[in-house]
A protein has these predicted regions:
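Multi-bladed beta-propeller domains
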Residues: 1-27, 35-36, 46-64, 92-117
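Residue-level detector of Asp-centered blade-edge/turn motifs that repeat once per structural unit
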Residues: 26-28, 70-71
Length: 377
């Protein structure tokens, strides 16, 4: 908080270890804001005069789009959960009760078989606690034998998977794949130390975390270790490229909007500051160059064997397409099965619906080709 003239500033969340969203001040003397916490997104509040941060809403779900009545006695928001695509709810400001105002997807959901994820908590090699989820494959409970598994990695890296609805993950589960998704170090929702756990070294602690999740899944589920895939988009695409340079445990990979070379990416992507802050400097400084190179998958591409599909939008300014082209060429020149599908007039955060449909089918075909898991429908 600050005075209208900008003076008298007070940090109301100085002792709070999460990232507050956009603040809204209420007549009752509180500042309301939402934030992500351990895979969920909820509403919080703190007194204007200072005090403890209080969580207002609860549950294993993600809430967004909060709006408030003029007197702040009531609020409305959108809620989504792993088997609920999202609807609008209203509640008193205390959130003691809530009323569902819409059932936009009720008719569609009634026709679908949706799958409930199981929460996982496991330790990385250095003892760090990591959270993840396993979405069981269609027929897993009733069937015997081992199932193929796909490790899905989020973007960011300062993002968060959790208790929201994902069409892509549900589709993979419906096609017979176990779907593992985790929040490795650099994810939000677990405190500042965790959020900056990859600072200066992408591909190290985060890699250890996701692979610890893979080992945990193998120990606790019927996983066919010869039919495992790995995929991600943006930072998740980068981490996919990194994973295939570090291990041959995966039978196939799909790298979406992926980075392979942090030096060539510098100053051509639309967020150059990320490289300087995350890797300790620009490439013309020795320290920055050292960290940029050591975290670049292209530098470690010798010996990669994992068949990999690359998908990328041609006008992606966040992750320019030449980043994926470099990794594709590195694999192709080594005789590794690789395919590149590029989409015109498609940027980082938006594709036309039909291009999204095409990408979905291309990816399913790749998984079927290398993991051979699509069940008879």
């Amino acid at each position: 908080m600050s005075d209208p003239d900008g003076g008298g500033r007070t940090n109301l969340t100085a002792d709070w270890d999460l990232i507050p969203g956009g603040p809204i001040t209420s007549p009752d003397g509180h500042v309301y804001f939402s934030t992500g916490v351990r895979g969920n997104t909820h509403l919080f509040r703190v007194p204007v005069g200072g005090g403890a941060v209080e969580q207002v809403t609860e549950g294993d779900r993600r809430l967004a789009g909060f709006s408030f009545s003029a007197d702040f006695s009531r609020m409305a928001y959108r809620a989504t959960a792993p088997t609920e695509p999202g609807d609008i709810y209203a509640a008193p400001i205390s959130a003691a009760t809530e009323t569902r105002l819409s059932e936009v997807n009720a008719a569609l959901v009634a026709q679908l078989e949706l799958f409930e994820p199981e929460n996982l908590v496991f330790q990385s090699p250095d003892g760090t606690e990591v959270e993840g989820w396993m979405l069981p494959a269609r027929g897993y409970d009733a069937a015997s034998g081992d199932f193929p598994m796909i490790l899905v990695m989020h973007g960011g890296p300062h993002g968060m998977y959790g208790n929201d609805f994902s069409f892509d993950r549900q589709l993979l589960a419906g096609q017979g794949y176990m779907v593992l998704y985790t929040n490795p170090r650099a994810s939000t929702g677990y405190g500042e130390d965790f959020r900056w756990g990859t600072w200066g070294g992408w591909g190290f602690n985060d890699y250890d975390d996701v692979m610890a999740g893979v080992d945990h899944a193998i120990d606790n589920y019927r996983i066919d270790t010869g039919r495992m895939g790995v995929t991600g988009y943006s930072y998740g695409g980068y981490l996919t490229n990194w994973v295939i340079t570090q291990t041959d445990r995966f039978a196939a990979a799909i790298a979406g909007a992926s980075i392979s070379n942090w030096v060539s990416d510098y100053a051509v992507a639309d967020i150059p500051r990320t490289k300087e802050s995350e890797f300790y400097g620009p490439p013309w400084e020795e320290r920055g160059l050292e960290h940029l190179l050591r975290s670049s998958p292209i530098i470690h591409a010798d010996g990669v064997t994992t068949p990999t599909l690359f998908v990328h939008g041609e006008i992606d300014h966040r992750v320019p397409i030449e980043e994926a082209e470099q990794m594709y060429v590195a694999l192709h020149k080594q005789g590794v099965p690789a395919k590149f599908v590029r989409y015109p007039e498609s940027y980082h955060g938006g594709w036309t619906p039909w291009r999204m449909v095409h990408r979905t089918w291309v990816q399913l075909d790749w998984w079927e080709q290398w993991l051979k898991a699509r069940p008879a429908m």
